[in-house]
Swiss-Prot record:
GO terms for biological process: actin filament organization; muscle contraction; osteoblast differentiation; platelet formation. Residues 15-47 are annotated as: Disordered. Residues 33-47 have a biased composition (Basic and acidic residues). The modification N6-acetyllysine is found at K177, K215. Pfam families: Tropomyosin. Residues 2-248 form a coiled coil. The modification Phosphothreonine is found at T216. The molecule is in a coiled coil structure that is formed by 2 polypeptide chains. The sequence exhibits a prominent seven-residues periodicity. PANTHER family: TROPOMYOSIN. Binds to actin filaments in muscle and non-muscle cells. Plays a central role, in association with the troponin complex, in the calcium dependent regulation of vertebrate striated muscle contraction. Smooth muscle contraction is regulated by interaction with caldesmon. In non-muscle cells is implicated in stabilizing cytoskeleton actin filaments. Binds calcium. Plays a role in platelet biogenesis. It comes from Homo sapiens. This is Tropomyosin alpha-4 chain. Detected in cardiac tissue and platelets, the form found in cardiac tissue is a higher molecular weight than the form found in platelets. Expressed at higher levels in the platelets of hypertensive patients with cardiac hypertrophy than in the platelets of hypertensive patients without cardiac hypertrophy (at protein level). The modification N-acetylalanine is found at A2.
Amino acid sequence: MAGLNSLEAVKRKIQALQQQADEAEDRAQGLQRELDGERERREKAEGDVAALNRRIQLVEEELDRAQERLATALQKLEEAEKAADESERGMKVIENRAMKDEEKMEIQEMQLKEAKHIAEEADRKYEEVARKLVILEGELERAEERAEVSELKCGDLEEELKNVTNNLKSLEAASEKYSEKEDKYEEEIKLLSDKLKEAETRAEFAERTVAKLEKTIDDLEEKLAQAKEENVGLHQTLDQTLNELNCI
């Protein structure tokens, strides 16, 4: 009778151990599923981080291109400013030439007045100064020719001054155009910089999330190892109990 009771006790112990082993196995499977899920989430987070890094790289490349366009625009603006300075210096040279021509014309007018005065004197003294009158008439003719040449030169100078003024206006318009482009490029660079900062912030958040997921996975792996050790212990106890039962 005592042997039967002992056998029943052993069977109950075996059943209890078997139940514990099944429960441990279920827990191990649940932990494994949870671990797999965490690994999938970690892989997804790593994919998000890689995508963000690619976006950051694209934004940086676009920013570099915008900076290159801005540098080109600034260089063209500088060249336009130099051309405007050269045109201004050319205008000053033309103004100086015009002033000199005006001075020459004033001198010629004075000479003309003097020639007329001499001609009047010659009329009164025709017989006496006939030879001088011929000379003065020749000088008057040459003076008139010089006056005509000066008038033609003044016309040419006025046309040249008009062309320089038009060129200067064109340069000013080009300078305003480049200034507008520069403002546009600066605004584009600011938008790209804001996007880059936003992408970097999202990348940092994703990296922190990955770190948390990795810690969770490590904890789950540790729990899984403990559960496996418990399962091995239960199996050893079960084997020992079966051996004892066989000995009986």
